[in-house]
Amino acid sequence: MQIYMVGGAVRDRLLGRPVHDRDWVVVGATPEQMRAQGYLPVGRDFPVFLHPATREEYALARTERKSGRGYRGFVVHSAPEVTLQEDLSRRDLTINAIATSADASGAGCLIDPHHGARDIAARVLRHVSTAFREDPVRILRVARFAARLPDFTVAPETLQLMREMVAHGETDHLVAERVWQELARGLMAEKPSRMFEVLRACGALERLLPEVERLWGVPQSAEHHPEIDTGAHLLLVLDMAARLQAPLAVRFACLAHDLGKGSTPADMLPRHIGHETRGAELLKHLAERLRVPADCRATADKVAREHGHIHCSNALSAAALVRLLERCDALRLPQRFADILLACECDARGRLGFAESAYPQRPRLTAALAAAQSVHSSAIAAQAAARGLAGPQVGALIRQARVAAVAQWLASQ
């Protein structure tokens, strides 16, 4: 039995990045031998075990053979005679196909049959072999790695292979959960814009997220958007979200906030009247198709519908501010409202020349919410009940009190 550290841990060590998770491959062993040594089997599709002490993953060396279309169309073969070189050859990118005989201390020699260390030094994402084309998820992984390692470029031959896979319809067979998983990881990467640039370059964005692809080539008012192109604006917004270390729900909201601009009638351009409502409907279909988690979907819906009003909120009256808070469900879900405001700040600063600009709407609306929250609604409801009032009448009294509290706060500014 021989054990090697493989994949991301080796790659990140060569890049000088922190190593958070280590993966290991075991050559020359059977599942029975692994269990006999105390390893806990956890793999469903192929033999993976957890180390009895470290809980790190140890996978038996394996090969994969294409048996059908899409992500799940594979036959996996794992046996003691499968070599380390065979296991490395099934991997997607050369930078991920490096092993080391290192122990936990990190000492040891590299086993690098596909010259991944050379590609790391050259900052290139390159496929290991033409077997890359057997798994369409690898298109998403390359795009995600481009976002995680933004100083890397995709090798021309790899990009061409990705284009051919898209043209042959391989991305049409991806399962929604896997698309969302890779999309979410790309959104949370260092430079999310790179993911979408790579997906556009190979044609996959049009097949997977046509609502997003349609934003390119759509002009906006140069007065408000010096970058003009809506797609260019989207990339700036996504990278601003990464810069501000926004959570996933905010980054997805940034991705989806302007979808309605892709369907603006040509005779209306560069104005986009009503794009908020159109965008919310497109978002609904996109989120259902990809099975986006409920928290991401809800935050994105509010941002799509309300970002224009939030941008203009500095001029709103107390009554209008309270109505905005109610539409955003801010009093019931203040943390989600904070996420909505952060997404709007990313939108405002994700414009050419505005990256360092202040966004006073965010602290202003946060303070307005605090003023509205200072109203003791339960006390008002009890007083109203004592007067024989109920239902909408009680709600109206609470709203009046919140408007008064916000008005008092406005007067103090």
Curated annotation (Swiss-Prot):
Reactions it catalyzes: a tRNA precursor + 2 CTP + ATP = a tRNA with a 3' CCA end + 3 diphosphate; a tRNA with a 3' CCA end + 2 CTP + ATP = a tRNA with a 3' CCACCA end + 3 diphosphate
Q: Where does Mg(2+) bind?
A: 21, 23
Q: What is its EC number?
A: 2.7.7.72, 3.1.3.-, 3.1.4.-
Q: Which Pfam families match?
A: HD, PolyA_pol, PolyA_pol_RNAbd
GO BP terms, alphabetized: RNA repair; tRNA 3'-terminal CCA addition
Instruction: Tell me the residue numbers annotated for binding ATP.
Output: 8, 11, 91, 141, 144
Family matches, as PROSITE patterns? HD
Which residues of this UniProt protein bind CTP?
A: 8, 11, 91, 141, 144
State if Membrane is listed as a keyword. no
Q: Where is the HD domain?
A: 230-331
Q: How is the cofactor bound?
A: Magnesium is required for nucleotidyltransferase activity.
Name the cofactor(s): Mg(2+); Ni(2+)
Q: Which GO terms describe its molecular function?
A: ATP binding; CCA tRNA nucleotidyltransferase activity; cyclic-nucleotide phosphodiesterase activity; magnesium ion binding; phosphatase activity; tRNA binding
Record InterPro entries: CCA_bact (IPR012006), HD/PDEase_dom (IPR003607), HD_domain (IPR006674), NT_sf (IPR043519), PolA_pol_head_dom (IPR002646), PolyA_RNA-bd (IPR032828), tRNA_CCA-adding_enzyme (IPR050124)
Q: Which key words are in the record?
A: ATP-binding, Hydrolase, Magnesium, Metal-binding, Multifunctional enzyme, Nickel, Nucleotide-binding, Nucleotidyltransferase, RNA repair, RNA-binding, Transferase, tRNA processing
What's this chain's function? Catalyzes the addition and repair of the essential 3'-terminal CCA sequence in tRNAs without using a nucleic acid template. Adds these three nucleotides in the order of C, C, and A to the tRNA nucleotide-73, using CTP and ATP as substrates and producing inorganic pyrophosphate. tRNA 3'-terminal CCA addition is required both for tRNA processing and repair. Also involved in tRNA surveillance by mediating tandem CCA addition to generate a CCACCA at the 3' terminus of unstable tRNAs. While stable tRNAs receive only 3'-terminal CCA, unstable tRNAs are marked with CCACCA and rapidly degraded.
Indicate the family of this protein. Belongs to the tRNA nucleotidyltransferase/poly(A) polymerase family. Bacterial CCA-adding enzyme type 1 subfamily.
Q: Its quaternary structure? A: Monomer. Can also form homodimers and oligomers.
Q: What else is known?
A: A single active site specifically recognizes both ATP and CTP and is responsible for their addition.
The free-text domain remark for this protein reads: Comprises two domains: an N-terminal domain containing the nucleotidyltransferase activity and a C-terminal HD domain associated with both phosphodiesterase and phosphatase activities.
Q: Which HAMAP family match?
A: CCA_bact_type1 (MF_01261)
What PANTHER family does the record tag this protein with? MULTIFUNCTIONAL CCA PROTEIN
Q: What name is this protein filed under? A: Multifunctional CCA protein
